[in-house]
A protein has these predicted regions:
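N-terminal lobe of the biotin/lipoate ligase/transferase fold
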Residues: 1-107, 111, 135
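Glycine-rich, charged/polar anion/phosphate-binding loops
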Residues: 126-136
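Structural motif
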Residues: 122-123
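A structural signal for short, well-ordered beta-strand segments
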Residues: 72-74, 118, 130-132, 146-150
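A broad structural signal for short, well-ordered beta-strand segments within beta-sheet-rich domains
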Residues: 16-17, 127, 141
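Short, acidic (Asp/Glu-rich) active-site segment that either coordinates a divalent metal cofactor
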Residues: 139-161
Length: 161
């Protein structure tokens, strides 16, 4: 379960997460962010304790139990469109840097890696996935949503995964 007070104490950003919403459950934090009308500002953060229909690239399902994982989306308003393809890569790099910032003395920490274009692994185990979606209206970019799911305390997975 996400503790907003702990989150606020550790927040070190200028704009990401300053405007935020915590949902107990939603079908998808990305869907929530993309569904009008939403008064989202640059850096708005949508967190959920549970996603009913989380998904990844190419419509693949994101499996996770309630209160066992971290689900969130960040809404941004890019000034340009020529670097949109980098959003997933930058997000994956940020996840790795965030994990490394805890200086965990675990032998697998040196096996953190990005599996192009949108997954983070420790060794052969996927620990996070990223889904970036862009919102266009009338041919103009209105915003981008960067959704992330982290396997935190997930201890079982469906056989087909």
């Amino acid at each position: 379960m996400i503790d907003i007070e702990v989150f606020e104490r550790h927040l070190r950003t200028k704009w990401v997460g300053r405007d935020r919403l915590l949902l107990e459950q939603t079908d998808s934090t990305n869907n929530y962010a993309k569904t009008p009308p939403r008064d989202l500002v640059h850096g708005s953060l949508i967190l959920a304790n549970y996603q009913l229909k989380g998904r990844g690239q190419s419509g693949k399902s994101w499996f996770g139990d309630a209160h066992k994982n971290l689900y969130f989306s960040i809404f941004i308003k890019p000034l340009r469109t020529d670097g949109l393809f980098l959003l997933s890569l930058i997000s994956a790099h940020s996840i790795i840097e965030s994990i490394r910032s805890y200086h965990l003395a675990h032998p697998l920490m040196n096996q953190l890696k990005i599996k192009w274009p949108n997954d983070v692994y420790i060794g052969e185990h996927k620990i996070a996935g990223i889904l970036t979606e862009n919102i266009f209206h009338g041919g103009f970019l209105k915003g981008s949503v960067i959704g992330t799911g982290w396997n935190i305390d997930q201890d079982h997975f469906p056989p087909k995964l």
